[in-house]
């Protein structure tokens, strides 16, 4: 690409960075806002006594599942070797991560905006608004999980995670940012590129109203994360070594 084209890619990556943060903020509100209690519900164990509730949940669950499958497909397909080779042939290697981040954010934003609740069937529901201890427990639990996720994103180099650093390095004719990292860290990033499987899983399942649509989302996304994040013993050993080094550094101070 010419320097002008690379500059445009860099500007696009900065815009994508800002948009991605906005979408993540929307996701926080979507997943972590306490849900209101509906009196018109059927416990999931009593479906045989009230089949009409099951029928009204069909439509939302089908559409929500399609939204999730679309997001998962995009998230996996754009990481494939086929897409990477195509972008390389088009001279867009420096924009690869930006394109990935932008399309991921668009799919996630579409899912959030168009999500259809199916609260006629619930697995459990807790009215946290009527109890200050329960409300604070819910808020603090989700808050800690989000702090862990954002902290992990910063540790994993957020500008690189969202594609800004790749576009900048390409403009400056540097090598890819990942090439400046150790082999062990590159191996870890190849296996997991988002922080905190546990944090995301807790956020998905620790809801005060576990309706059938939320259950479908929690099950599909945690299953996808479990299958996609394939860390091995080398990754675990590397992280243990880094943790020990950090402890020694803190003691030295």
Swiss-Prot record:
Membership in a protein family: Belongs to the nurim family.
Compartments reported by the entry: Nucleus inner membrane
Protein name in UniProt: Nurim homolog
Membrane topology, Nuclear segments: 1-2, 79-96, 162-188, 232-253
Organism superkingdom: Eukaryota
Membrane topology label: Multi-pass membrane protein
GO cellular component terms attached to this protein's record: nuclear envelope; nuclear inner membrane; nuclear membrane
Gene this protein is translated from: nrm
TM regions (residue ranges): 3-30, 57-78, 97-113, 133-161, 189-207, 214-231
Perinuclear space face residues: 31-56, 114-132, 208-213
Swiss-Prot/TrEMBL keywords: Membrane, Nucleus, Transmembrane, Transmembrane helix
InterPro entries recorded: Nurim-like
